[in-house]
Each structure stands twice: as structure tokens, then as C-alpha cells.
């Protein structure tokens, strides 16, 4: 019984692998081998140059509604500056 189940699982795995490897998907405008027809590329460039697809940012954007970032002071719980603790051997830099 164990051998039959193993063979069944192997056949199912083989069927799945063959299904994925034998099928081929071509996107619209693409030819086999990943090449595009010259007419499609030219039409794409013309569409990009027309300027009709330019999106404008709305005046009330969500970024404006975000609260400002609060800066954390560089002092630890004991009141010592963290810069001095991180870089004890540095001189002349603040």
C-alpha cells in the first residue's frame, strides 16, 4: 500500500511540473521569445509622449495630513548625552 501511495504522489508531482513547464504565457503585444513587434513599441512611445496619461497630485494629499515626526533627544535615562557614550574617543566633532 505504501508503494502505491508513493507512486501516486510522484505521478501527481510530475503532472504538476509538466503542466507548469509546458504552458506558455504571452503578454499582449509580445511575441514568442520575449520580443515585441516594432509597431507595438512605436505605439507605446507615442502614447507616452502624448502627455495624456500624466497624473496630478491632489492638493489635499494624505502626506499633508500626517503628524510631524518628533525628534527624540539624545540624552539617556541618566542624563548623559548619547553621542559621548557612542563615540568616546572622537574629538572636535559635535
From Swiss-Prot:
Pyrrolidone carboxylic acid carried by residues: 24
Any GO CC annotation of this UniProt entry: extracellular space
One Pfam family in the UniProt entry: GnRH
Signal peptide limits: 1-23
UniProt xrefs under InterPro entries: GnRH, Gonadoliberin
Modified residues (Glycine amide): 33
MF terms (GO), sorted A to Z: gonadotropin hormone-releasing hormone activity; gonadotropin-releasing hormone receptor binding
Localisation per UniProt entry: Secreted
Keywords: Amidation, Cleavage on pair of basic residues, Hormone, Pyrrolidone carboxylic acid, Secreted, Signal
PROSITE patterns attached to this UniProt entry: GNRH
TM stretches of this protein: none
Role, per record: Stimulates the secretion of gonadotropins.
Similarity comment text for this entry: Belongs to the GnRH family.
Full protein name: Progonadoliberin-3
Originating organism: Carassius auratus (Goldfish)
Source species taxonomy: Eukaryota, Metazoa, Chordata, Craniata, Vertebrata
Amino acid at each position: 500500500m505504501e508503494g502505491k501511495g508513493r507512486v501516486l504522489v510522484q505521478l501527481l508531482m510530475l503532472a504538476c511540473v509538466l503542466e507548469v513547464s509546458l504552458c506558455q504565457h504571452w503578454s499582449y503585444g509580445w511575441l514568442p521569445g520575449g520580443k515585441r513587434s516594432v509597431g507595438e513599441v512605436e505605439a507605446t512611445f507615442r502614447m507616452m509622449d502624448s502627455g495624456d496619461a500624466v497624473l496630478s497630485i491632489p492638493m489635499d494629499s494624505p502626506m499633508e495630513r500626517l503628524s510631524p515626526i518628533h525628534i527624540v533627544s539624545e540624552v539617556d535615562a541618566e542624563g548623559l548625552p548619547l553621542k559621548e557614550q557612542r563615540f568616546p574617543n572622537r574629538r572636535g566633532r559635535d
